[in-house]
Amino acid sequence: MAYHSFLVEPISCHAWNKDRTQIAICPNNHEVHIYEKSGAKWTKVHELKEHNGQVTGIDWAPESNRIVTCGTDRNAYVWTLKGRTWKPTLVILRINRAARCVRWAPNENKFAVGSGSRVISICYFEQENDWWVCKHIKKPIRSTVLSLDWHPNNVLLAAGSCDFKCRIFSAYIKEVEERPAPTPWGSKMPFGELMFESSSSCGWVHGVCFSASGSRVAWVSHDSTVCLADADKKMAVATLASETLPLLALTFITDNSLVAAGHDCFPVLFTYDAAAGMLSFGGRLDVPKQSSQRGLTARERFQNLDKKASSEGGTAAGAGLDSLHKNSVSQISVLSGGKAKCSQFCTTGMDGGMSIWDVKSLESALKDLKIK
């Protein structure tokens, strides 16, 4: 486990380049900062300044090396590296509320933007007019779209929203791709077709993720539940009410294992038993090292009561948390190995820090941890 603190400000979103030597982060404002690793240090090499509202989503296309950003100014920008400068291209999303999240499609020929306008904008490049255009997926979304993830086939798109639903839509754009082959989620996939809709839960859907095979989709809600739908089992949904505070982000690290994190400030593991169709809690992945405890003198106890409203030592803001992150984890991304067999993943948080987690090291450090 490696932790690096970039900022005093929260990191609201991040994205990595292809070879993982650079990371783009938003310091909770209208800018995007790109850091490059040199030895053990991270050095700021670029600042992307075009939005006039807070940046809410970043994604970095690995093959084309283009960055897409969206923000509360209701716009998206596609950034292209020319020489040593990132040049922005405005994408008109045709929305009247803030954009909330953005994701490149796997083939990098289009991207999706979720927004507070109760629509998903599917944007693609029109060669004839030399311009980015978008189509809207509207029905039956009834509230802000908070999270998006693409199916490996480049057509299906999972969306989590504030109307307590996880849905899968077809985002087939005939102008830029061939007709898709049938999937376990369905065979007919015209643009905007609703392929799956979860039954009502009791919370906003903060994060959504497809498995590497695309036959499973998982999501986390504000009521601290984790859900998984399996297309190979007639879209049966497994639900687990976790004991954590609400989770904000998740990712598959194998086809049967999920890592999620949120307001508890540390990642947790969930495993899926396909035979039983059940989710189970796999354990906390951030177990603190036990430090030697010594008794407090009466003087120290009264000082702590006066300064920190606590009689225990080390409970200043953030200092009392026995986790690497000292505030909510806002995003998780797979660093190496992919979703099928992840070997490293990354978390960024509202404490302005980034943690890199090694799966094998976690397995050896935690005796009861079993990643299937």
UniProtKB/Swiss-Prot annotation:
Example GO BP: Arp2/3 complex-mediated actin nucleation
UniProt keyword Cytoplasm present: yes
Keywords, comma-separated and alphabetical: Actin-binding, Cytoplasm, Cytoskeleton, Disease variant, Nucleus, Repeat, WD repeat
PROSITE patterns in the cross-refs: WD_REPEATS_2, WD_REPEATS_REGION
WD repeat feature ranges: 6-45, 50-89, 94-135, 140-179, 242-280, 324-367
Gene Ontology CC: one annotated term: cytosol
InterPro entries: ARPC1 (IPR017383), WD40/YVTN_repeat-like_dom_sf (IPR015943), WD40_repeat_dom_sf (IPR036322), WD40_rpt (IPR001680)
Annotated Gene3D superfamilies: YVTN repeat-like/Quinoprotein amine dehydrogenase
Domain of life, source organism: Eukaryota
A GO molecular-function descriptor: structural constituent of cytoskeleton
Main location (coarse class): cytoplasm
Localisation per UniProt entry: Cytoplasm, Cytoskeleton; Nucleus
Disorder named in the UniProt entry: Immunodeficiency 71 with inflammatory disease and congenital thrombocytopenia: An autosomal recessive disorder characterized by platelet abnormalities, vasculitis, eosinophilia, and predisposition to inflammatory diseases.
Similarity field: Belongs to the WD repeat ARPC1 family.
Function: Component of the Arp2/3 complex, a multiprotein complex that mediates actin polymerization upon stimulation by nucleation-promoting factor (NPF). The Arp2/3 complex mediates the formation of branched actin networks in the cytoplasm, providing the force for cell motility. In addition to its role in the cytoplasmic cytoskeleton, the Arp2/3 complex also promotes actin polymerization in the nucleus, thereby regulating gene transcription and repair of damaged DNA.
Description of how the protein assembles with itself and partners: Component of the Arp2/3 complex composed of ACTR2/ARP2, ACTR3/ARP3, ARPC1B/p41-ARC, ARPC2/p34-ARC, ARPC3/p21-ARC, ARPC4/p20-ARC and ARPC5/p16-ARC.
Protein name: Actin-related protein 2/3 complex subunit 1B
Organism of provenance: Homo sapiens (Human)
Organism placement in taxonomy: Eukaryota, Metazoa, Chordata, Craniata, Vertebrata
